[in-house]
Amino acid sequence: MTEGEGRIQLEPSWKARVGDWLLRPQMRELSAFLRQRKAAGARVFPPGPQIFAAFDATPFEQVKVVILGQDPYHGEGQAHGLCFSVLPGVPVPPSLLNIYKEIQDDLGIARPDHGYLMPWARQGVLLLNAVLTVEQGRAGAHQNKGWEGFTDHVVETLNREREGLVFLLWGSYAQSKGKVIDQTRHRVLKAPHPSPLSAHRGFLGCQHFSKTNDHLRRRGLSPIDWSLPPRSALDLTSAGA
């Protein structure tokens, strides 16, 4: 996906640091692949302007926490560019329900009535999928097409140019992608994936949300407010909405 294509633009602070990667041959090949799939009638999610929504919502210097996902939701109207998040009005996916359960158990915060995580992103939580597109009804359809190299570069750049970030690595895929992170410079918290298949193996009870805030406070930074406003009070003017 070339950065200048159509309406798709990378947020300026990210463009300055990782935009060069979008000019590489493998990204031109990815862009051609996406055009071919759309021409063949495939429905690609999220919509083009939302592919880079995670970067729009959380500029480079504002990142405090990184949550790594795998690839976007593949159901109608679900994916909007932030990992684990869905737009208001879309049923909350099972993995996110388990995230909410852990937040409630960890911090006493009641489960919200939606799955829209933009308020976290605005506070500095980069909600980054390893693969930024998918096709309707075909989980993982765009894996190994070029996105992973770009998002690896994003993680490597954060690791190198920032200090004291918290990386939340849930599941073996995220943990493998996070192997490059220097744990003497950053806090890395690992747990099984919040999927119903694995959450009971250690995600539930991991206390990652309170541990994240403890780390931020120790560094003199404001903690993340993991609570979410009710759906009726959401601000839907930002990227991805």
Curated annotation (Swiss-Prot):
It is found in: Cytoplasm. GO terms for biological process: base-excision repair, AP site formation via deaminated base removal. The keyword Hydrolase applies. InterPro entries: UDG_fam1, Ura-DNA_Glyclase_AS, Uracil-DNA_glycosylase-like, Uracil-DNA_glycosylase-like_sf. GO terms for molecular function: uracil DNA N-glycosylase activity. It is an enzyme of class 3 (hydrolase). One of its GO terms (cellular component) is cytoplasm. It catalyses: Hydrolyzes single-stranded DNA or mismatched double-stranded DNA and polynucleotides, releasing free uracil. Its EC number is 3.2.2.27. CDD domains: UDG-F1-like (cd10027). The active site is at D71. SUPFAM superfamilies: Uracil-DNA glycosylase-like. Excises uracil residues from the DNA which can arise as a result of misincorporation of dUMP residues by DNA polymerase or due to deamination of cytosine. Belongs to the uracil-DNA glycosylase (UDG) superfamily. UNG family. HAMAP family: UDG (MF_00148). PANTHER family: URACIL-DNA GLYCOSYLASE. This is Uracil-DNA glycosylase. It comes from Xanthomonas axonopodis pv. citri (strain 306). The gene is ung.
